[in-house]
Amino acid sequence: GPKGKGKGGPAAEQPPPGSGAGKSRRRRTAFTSEQLLELEKEFHCKKYLSLTERSQIAHALKLSEVQVKIWFQNRRAKWKRIKAGNVSNRSGEPVRNPKIVRAHPGARQSLRRAQPAPADRAGA
């Protein structure tokens, strides 16, 4: 099941380009639109694949299981970003994050209320 929530295995480890790391790291896979369509369809049904499902999809799409695994891994990451709302909506307006707007409703007012006090006392 989707219990391994740590870092992925060596397959997920991609050294930054130009770092000289990564022993002959594989080229970026160019998926065909048919493959992407199928992968997206599967992802729409379930966010996590069993080993059997993964191997069946890999065979059906003539991909390696690692490719299917990594695609799902990346797709889940993208899905979580979108779900968290860090992605602009269609109108191009950035999504307002209510958590940021109302960080501390009382904080600023209490500060403002505290400042005039000494002046009032001086004027009294």
Curated annotation (Swiss-Prot):
Its main location: nucleus. The keyword Oxidoreductase does not apply. Residues 1-30, 83-124 are annotated as: Disordered. Residues 24-83 bind DNA. It is found in: Nucleus. Keywords: Developmental protein, DNA-binding, Homeobox, Nucleus. It comes from the Eukaryota. Signal peptide: none annotated. One of its GO terms (biological process) is regulation of nervous system development. GO terms for cellular component: nucleus. GO terms for molecular function: DNA-binding transcription factor activity, RNA polymerase II-specific; RNA polymerase II transcription regulatory region sequence-specific DNA binding. SUPFAM superfamilies: Homeodomain-like (SSF46689). Pfam families: Homeodomain (PF00046). The keyword Nucleus applies. SMART domains: HOX (SM00389). This is Homeobox protein CHOX-7. The lineage of its organism: Eukaryota, Metazoa, Chordata, Craniata, Vertebrata.
